[in-house]
Each structure stands twice: as C-alpha cells, then as structure tokens.
Amino acid sequence: MTAIIDVQQAFEGEEVISIDIPSPAELELWANAVLKYEGLSDQEVTIRFTDEAESQSLNSEYRGKHKPTNVLSFPFEAPPGIEINLLGDLVICAPVISREAEEQDKQVSDHYAHMTVHGLLHLMGYDHIDDAEAEEMEGKEIDILAQLGIDNPYDADE
C-alpha cells in the first residue's frame, strides 16, 4: 500500500509558517501507516496547508462554523461504476496546528501527525459525532500514532 500525496501550500501575505509544515516524506509515512492499519491499497490524497483566513472561510462555508480549524476533510465520492483510489482532500491550517501544539505542550510534528491521521480517518468515513464513534476513531488514532512512535494525543484530556 502506498499513499500518493499531492501537497499544496496556500498562504497569503508575508506569513512565514511554512517552516513548521511537515515534509512530503513525513506525510507519506503517516498516510501509509493509516492505509496499512485500515488494510487499504494505494490511495491518493491532496493535503493543502492554509492560513487562518482560508481555513475560516472553508469552515464557515462547509460546517457553518465561523472560525479557523485545525483540519477539514473533503472525501471524494466517485460516480457509480467508476473505480478510483482517491480518498479526497485534507485542508490543514498551519497556524492553528502550531498554536494548538504550543497550548497543549506537544511537539508540532506530533500534532501534525495526529491531525493528518485524524483527517485521513475522516476521509475513510470515520467520525466522532457521538461517544461511540469518537471512542472508535480515537482508538484508531492512538493505535496508528503508537505505531509511529508518537504518544497518545488524548492523554492530556483524560
């Protein structure tokens, strides 16, 4: 199984936040861990890194929430009869990830890994709307991150 990652960086103005953005190799490592865990074959995903303005605009348009968020997922739905290994798109807000990592006393790279895994699971149909769904999804995140040598991101929440 291989993840094919199309990375986009979309920043306006003079923001210098790309320094924290994971490398394509890191993104592929994290995505491949998710694919392996879920038993999926080759999949393609676009990961777009944005500023807060774009994140807030998309979050408002698609979720009715008028603030930037860490990650948004847009699953690809192929027309009936069309087979394509395209999971969809992730939109990751770099300033939110950096801020959350600092607030939660986490390594920025670990938080990027967590939000990438989280977003990919959303693309695969997992959600956390109710407690049972959240428990299942968080369990998968914890397992996948552990395989990557990353501590349980929810430990601070418990």
Swiss-Prot record:
Binding site for Zn(2+): 118, 122, 128
GO terms for biological process, alphabetical: rRNA processing
Annotated compartments: Cytoplasm
Keyword rRNA processing: yes
Top-level class of the enzyme under EC nomenclature: hydrolase
Enzyme Commission identifier(s): 3.1.-.-
Organism superkingdom: Bacteria
InterPro entries in alphabetical order: MetalPrtase_cat_dom_sf_prd, YbeY, YbeY_CS
Keywords from the named record: Cytoplasm, Endonuclease, Hydrolase, Metal-binding, Nuclease, Ribosome biogenesis, rRNA processing, Zinc
GO molecular function (one): metalloendopeptidase activity
Signal sequence segment: none
GO CC terms, sorted: cytoplasm
Note describing how the cofactor binds: Binds 1 zinc ion.
Principal place of residence: cytoplasm
SUPFAM superfamilies for this protein: Metalloproteases ('zincins'), catalytic domain (SSF55486)
Cofactor(s) this protein requires: Zn(2+)
HAMAP family in the cross-refs: Endoribonucl_YbeY
Family classification: Belongs to the endoribonuclease YbeY family.
Function summary: Single strand-specific metallo-endoribonuclease involved in late-stage 70S ribosome quality control and in maturation of the 3' terminus of the 16S rRNA.
Xref: PANTHER family: ENDORIBONUCLEASE YBEY, CHLOROPLASTIC (PTHR46986:SF1)
Protein name in UniProt: Endoribonuclease YbeY
Organism: Alteromonas mediterranea (strain DSM 17117 / CIP 110805 / LMG 28347 / Deep ecotype)
Lineage start: Bacteria, Pseudomonadati, Pseudomonadota, Gammaproteobacteria, Alteromonadales
Gene that specifies this protein: ybeY
